[in-house]
């Protein structure tokens, strides 16, 4: 399953990558589970979750080890290796826990519905319904935690744009639901084919496969129809945005060499973009990694703003009480702060330490600041000269509900600002894939500026109109458009999850009400 994710992008693997997990569930007989078997039950589920979860989350998220070496932060080489390994194991384990809880939920369904007179084939349909609903429910729950990146849905991004259009209807949960259900029916068909238990073998063997194919055709065909809807943007809503990809390595980012290189690169890029007609310029997360007051007092970049009088979205740090924030600032053409967005979803261990009273002395922080960063408030939108903007800073791209809350507050376009220099090219490709999904779900234009790549312009159908190279200094100017309407997912959020769970609950009660008293 991990092979389906960007940048490798073997997206078709996702449509059968969950089959082994489904087959294991169908083969495991939990209908007569008792307490004496509980230990073996938990062990078998744990091992299965580790095997499948490790193959998906462990492979897809292996890029996290790219933080090593951290010697540029003064961390010894071996300690840096230990930190990288711990981060990878932690995020993989969190995914494994999701799979384990799902396996428990499936077992609970089997045990509680074992004594029923419901037709066995229909019972299997209901079981797949529950599997789909519970998986989507768990992914949604996990997406509200502090640690999230990898829904099953993102295996289809950025290449499968027709299928991804369903995100505008039901968000990532609907995409995951299609994939999980298809895997479930394919698994049933494969089991039935191998067992060959029925009298009318050919008919029985193929109807599960047929259902899986019909679901796949429906979501692909329906997505194609959604993709054909014209954008209908008007010239009055156009904003000419300039993007600067600074390409400042982390190894020098926070010393005098990095400061001088950043000032020179961003100032030169800013001036060139204004000459090309950019009405506002977007910079990456932490483009100038200091407080705004320092930027004003000590940088030629600020003087360039005063000279050209073209506003800028600047990645810098802000203050909040006695702490600091990772912020994107709107600076108008007179050099005044017009607005500020403070990053809400901070990176665990990198920007703050969860349960710092317990673990603060055990784990070295990856942040260069002397203090932990503080989260911003929610919801926020960023005031700009062109209307309110929805913003995601780096890690926040993985949290669709965070962006949706900003659209509900009036966000008319999306700004994505990231560093990405900490990690490998794999992370940059997956980050871009997530932003493609966010643009579709929000029905908004998205401008994306990163330090080392991949920077991009993405339209509301998820089409990438421009994509930068990796690890190169680049500037680019392109139009985006303001949009104000709210589509189904933006307005109603995870209604698909709620609907699936309600229907599953009704199906469960139906089976409980009709126990197996005659057969």
Curated annotation (Swiss-Prot):
UniProt keyword annotations, A-Z: Acyltransferase, Cell inner membrane, Cell membrane, Membrane, Transferase, Transmembrane, Transmembrane helix
Source organism phylogeny: Bacteria, Bacillati, Cyanobacteriota, Cyanophyceae, Synechococcales
PROSITE patterns on file: CN_HYDROLASE
Similarity comment: family membership: Belongs to the CN hydrolase family. Apolipoprotein N-acyltransferase subfamily.
Main location: membrane
Signal peptide: none
EC number annotated for this UniProt entry: 2.3.1.269
Gene Ontology CC, one term: plasma membrane
Pathway the protein contributes to: Protein modification; lipoprotein biosynthesis (N-acyl transfer)
One GO molecular-function entry: N-acyltransferase activity
Compartment list: Cell inner membrane
CN hydrolase domain boundaries: 244-482
Entry keyword Acyltransferase: yes
Function: Catalyzes the phospholipid dependent N-acylation of the N-terminal cysteine of apolipoprotein, the last step in lipoprotein maturation.
Enzyme class: transferase
UniProt topology in membrane: Multi-pass membrane protein
A GO BP annotation: lipoprotein biosynthetic process
Transmembrane segments annotated in the record for this chain: 6-26, 47-67, 83-103, 126-146, 174-194, 206-226, 496-516
Keyword hit for Membrane: yes
HAMAP family, A to Z: Lnt (MF_01148)
Organism whose genome encodes this protein: Synechocystis sp. (strain ATCC 27184 / PCC 6803 / Kazusa)
Name of the protein in its database record: Apolipoprotein N-acyltransferase
Annotated active site: 285 (proton acceptor), 343, 394 (nucleophile)
């Amino acid at each position: 399953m991990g092979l389906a994710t960007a940048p490798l992008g073997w997206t078709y693997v996702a449509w059968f990558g969950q089959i082994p997990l489904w087959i294991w569930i169908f083969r495991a007989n939990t209908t007569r589970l008792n307490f004496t078997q509980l230990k073996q039950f938990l062990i078998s589920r744990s091992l299965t979750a580790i095997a499948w979860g490790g193959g998906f989350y462990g492979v897809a998220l292996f890029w996290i080890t790219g933080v090593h070496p951290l010697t540029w932060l003064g961390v010894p080489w071996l300690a840096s290796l230990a930190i990288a390994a711990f981060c990878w194991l932690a995020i993989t384990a969190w995914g494994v826990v999701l799979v384990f809880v799902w396996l428990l939920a499936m077992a609970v369904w089997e045990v509680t519905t074992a004594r029923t007179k419901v037709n066995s084939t229909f019972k299997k349909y209901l079981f797949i319904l529950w599997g789909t609903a519970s998986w989507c429910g768990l992914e949604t729950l996990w997406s509200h935690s502090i640690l999230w990146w990898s829904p099953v849905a993102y295996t289809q991004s950025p290449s499968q744009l027709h299928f991804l259009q369903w995100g505008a209807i039901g968000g990532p949960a609907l995409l995951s639901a299609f994939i999980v259900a298809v895997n479930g029916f394919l698994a049933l068909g494969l089991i039935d084919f191998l067992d060959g238990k029925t009298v009318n073998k050919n008919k029985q063997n193929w109807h599960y496969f047929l259902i899986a194919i019909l679901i796949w055709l429906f979501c692909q065909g329906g997505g194609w129809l959604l993709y054909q809807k014209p954008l209908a943007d008007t010239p009055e809503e156009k904003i000419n945005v300039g993007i600067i990809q600074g390409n400042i390595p982390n190894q020098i980012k926070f010393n005098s060499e990095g400061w001088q290189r950043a000032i020179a690169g961003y100032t030169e890029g800013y001036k060139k973009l204004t000459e090309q007609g950019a009405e506002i310029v977007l910079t990456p997360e932490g483009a100038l990694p200091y407080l705004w007051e320092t930027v004003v007092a000590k940088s030629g970049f600020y003087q360039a703003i005063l000279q050209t009088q073209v506003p800028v979205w600047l990645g810098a740090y802000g203050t909040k009480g006695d702490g600091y924030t990772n912020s994107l600032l709107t600076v108008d053409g007179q050099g005044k702060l017009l607005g500020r967005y403070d990053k809400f979803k901070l990176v665990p261990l990198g920007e703050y330490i969860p349960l710092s009273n317990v673990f603060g002395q055990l784990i070295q922080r990856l942040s260069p600041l002397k203090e932990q960063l503080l989260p911003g408030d929610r919801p926020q939108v960023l005031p700009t000269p062109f209307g309110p903007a929805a913003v995601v800073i780096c890690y926040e791209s993985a949290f669709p509900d965070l962006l949706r809350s900003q659209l509900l507050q009036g966000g008319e376009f999306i700004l994505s600002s990231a560093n990405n220099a900490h990690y490998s090219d794999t992370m940059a490709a997956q980050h871009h894939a997530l932003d493609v999904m966010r643009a579709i779900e929000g029905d908004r234009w998205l401008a994306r500026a990163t330090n080392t790549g991949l920077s991009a312009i993405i339209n509301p159908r998820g089409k990438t109109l421009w994509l930068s190279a990796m690890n190169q200094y680049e500037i680019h100017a392109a139009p985006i458009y303001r949009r104000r309407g709210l589509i189904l997912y933006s307005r109603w959020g995870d209604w698909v999850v709620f609907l699936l769970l309600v229907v599953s609950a009704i199906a469960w009660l139906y089976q409980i009400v009709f126990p197996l008293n005659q057969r």
